[in-house]
A protein has these predicted regions:
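The feature marks the mature, well-folded catalytic cores of soluble enzymes
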Residues: 1-160
């Protein structure tokens, strides 16, 4: 039996970048990582062997420490708490997610923001935290109906998806 591996299989460019940069950082020093850096147990195990300490909340990091922001990004509050605790965030968020975050911040005051993705996924949660209350995450068809009510209540004339 012949097994063919597609050219596009494997990690996306954002995850490749995050893992590569985290490895470089860990060669020099041990740092925290907020949540699993990527959804790959082998990669997480390898990085822990290099000294990465996974924490679940920015509040778990010591003052004046360094914390990697994983490929999926983080919620807005994380950046605020880090500043208060003098924590240096080593932001390895995927470039595409960073670009979406910038666009959300640009449009949040004059548009209803719709994020399409899993409601429980760190990427969706993080992006929504940068939007105003006039936003929602659509995961399935039911959510489309619910979002229509939210859009109508918002009194906004623009929708940004």
């Amino acid at each position: 039996m012949e097994i063919i591996i597609g050219k596009t299989s494997g990690f996306c460019k954002g995850v490749e970048h995050t893992v590569r940069e985290a490895s470089k950082i860990l060669e020099k020093e041990k740092v925290y990582c907020l949540g699993e850096i990527v959804h790959n147990e082998r990669v997480v195990t390898d990085l822990k062997k290099l000294g990465m300490i996974t924490i679940n909340n920015i509040s778990d990091a010591k003052n004046n420490s360094k914390v990697i922001v994983r490929a999926h990004g983080e919620v807005k509050e994380t950046y605020e708490i880090a500043k208060e605790k003098n924590i240096e965030l080593l932001d390895l968020t995927c470039g595409k997610i960073k670009a979406i975050k910038v666009k959300i911040e640009k449009h949040k005051n004059d548009s209803f923001i719709i994020i399409i993705g899993k409601k429980s996924h760190p990427e969706s949660i993080g992006l929504k935290s940068f939007a105003s209350n006039n936003s929602c995450i659509i995961e399935n068809e039911e959510d489309i109906e619910k979002s229509l009510d939210l859009i109508n209540k918002s009194n906004l004339n623009k929708i940004y998806i």
